[in-house]
């Protein structure tokens, strides 16, 4: 881990350690909540060797797995009238570190006596992109498998910095919020999209996490300074990134949110095997509460990522990426919910390095039924099927077009 990366993470951890004593006189105790997630998984694929470029984390043909998928613990405490703190530790199946910090945040939310509201947060947290992953420890109340967009957010996007929001609230509860953030430690965002493509799962990277690259020998034959693993929250150039957007909401009716993100990474910088990836995108989401206890959620993302110096008219790697998802969920009776989601996503190669194919066109369906008992116990039955065309599969002599199915039975206990 390089010095810039470790300095940023050290600041976040130090913040969480020293803050409670500083506010000790006003500290009102700690609340703890979390979850444990147990999973049975079966995968089916056209090719049993289709693992590196599978659309699922547990790729391959005819695999049966039972494991503890995830465990999370969140501690929250009020640090005064306007300040609260929160830190989440996670265990994740296949994680680089068995237990690590997922989020560590200080919230500032002063009481307002006018329609104008100001709040802020400082630390390590997710940018306000997802409208689905709103439950405990960034899980979804609708499905086990996240959408392609939210899967990538969980893998490679996390804010290490500060965010401020200014909102105007009407008496009926309607409000508009404008937000912006500055951050570091996100210079490698885009690595997985370009080298591997999109993937659908429910894994959220922790702050010291890392991912093995697909077909690493081939990647290193072209980019000799690239590490065998990518660190999703590395700082390589010392330049801050930013995002900005707005949110429109009528509570319990409709919510619209959009933002523009730019990590401002220098694509020509390499440090400790980690390249800077200049990644920019626009994200938009709409959530509508419909009659008959129906919920509709649409999310879209369109962006570009670049790495390396110019080769011809483009950066060494220059990839456009896009994704859309549409989820419809219905609460049948108390404690019972069914959800269906369609995802379509892909990447387009702009660069001129023919030895590095990285184009993709894919789509997927997810159907989920969950049953919640006594608030704390939830059973999920889910199937996700994906049809994908990924040109990078040809590097492993695999047909670029693959059909995969993921069956899951999940038991979650919340506390």
Write out the residue ranges for each language-model feature.
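Hydrophobic alpha-helix-in-membranes signature
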Residues: 19-20, 127, 290
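Outer-membrane beta-barrel biogenesis signature
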Residues: 14-62, 186-191, 195-219, 232, ...
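Compositionally biased regions
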Residues: 7-8, 17, 284, 326
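Bacterial N-terminal signal peptides that target proteins for export
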Residues: 1-10
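Signature for the C-terminal beta-barrel architecture of outer-membrane proteins
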Residues: 108-120, 156-326
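Outer-membrane beta-barrel pore domains
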Residues: 28, 45-47, 60, 105-108, ...
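Outer membrane beta-barrel
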Residues: 26-43, 62-196, 247-251, 327-332, ...
């Amino acid at each position: 881990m390089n010095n810039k990366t470790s300095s940023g993470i050290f600041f976040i951890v130090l913040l969480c350690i020293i803050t409670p004593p500083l506010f000790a006189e006003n500290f009102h105790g700690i609340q703890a909540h979390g979850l444990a997630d147990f999973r049975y998984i079966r995968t089916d694929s056209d090719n049993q060797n289709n693992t590196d470029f599978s659309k699922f984390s547990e790729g391959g043909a005819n695999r049966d797995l039972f494991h503890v998928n995830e465990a999370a613990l969140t501690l929250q405490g009020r640090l005064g009238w306007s300040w609260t703190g929160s830190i989440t530790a996670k265990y994740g199946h296949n994680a680089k570190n068995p237990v690590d910090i997922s989020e560590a945040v200080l919230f500032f939310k002063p009481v307002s006596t006018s329609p104008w509201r100001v709040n802020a947060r400082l630390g390590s947290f997710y940018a306000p992109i997802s409208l689905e992953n709103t439950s405990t420890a960034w899980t979804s109340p609708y499905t086990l498998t996240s959408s392609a967009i939210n899967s990538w957010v969980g893998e490679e996007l996390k804010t290490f910095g500060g965010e401020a929001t200014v909102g105007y609230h009407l008496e009926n509860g309607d409000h508009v919020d404008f937000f912006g953030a500055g951050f570091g430690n996100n210079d490698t965002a885009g690595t997985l999209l370009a080298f591997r493509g999109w993937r659908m799962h429910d894994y959220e990277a922790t702050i010291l996490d890392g991912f093995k690259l697909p077909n690493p020998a081939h990647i290193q034959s072209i980019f000799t300074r690239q590490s065998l693993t990518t660190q999703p929250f590395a700082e390589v150039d010392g330049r801050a990134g930013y995002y900005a957007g707005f949110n429109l909401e009528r509570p319990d009716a409709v919510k619209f949110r959009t933002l523009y993100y730019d990590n401002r990474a220098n694509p020509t910088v390499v440090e400790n095997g980690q390249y800077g990836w200049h990644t920019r995108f626009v994200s938009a989401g709409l959530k509508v509460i419909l009659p008959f206890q129906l919920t509709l959620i649409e999310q879209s993302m369109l962006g570009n990522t670049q790495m390396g110096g110019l080769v011809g008219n483009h950066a060494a790697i220059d990839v456009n990426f896009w994704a859309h998802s549409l989820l419809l969920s219905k609460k049948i009776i108390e404690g019972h919910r069914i959800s269906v989601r369609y995802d379509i996503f892909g990447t387009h190669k702009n660069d001129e390095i023919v030895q590095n194919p990285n184009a993709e066109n894919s789509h997927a369906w997810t159907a989920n039924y969950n049953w919640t008992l006594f608030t704390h116990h939830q059973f999920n039955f889910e199937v996700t099927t994906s049809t994908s065309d990924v040109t990078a599969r040809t590097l492993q002599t695999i047909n670029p077009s693959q059909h995969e199915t993921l069956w899951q039975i999940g038991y979650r206990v919340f506390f």
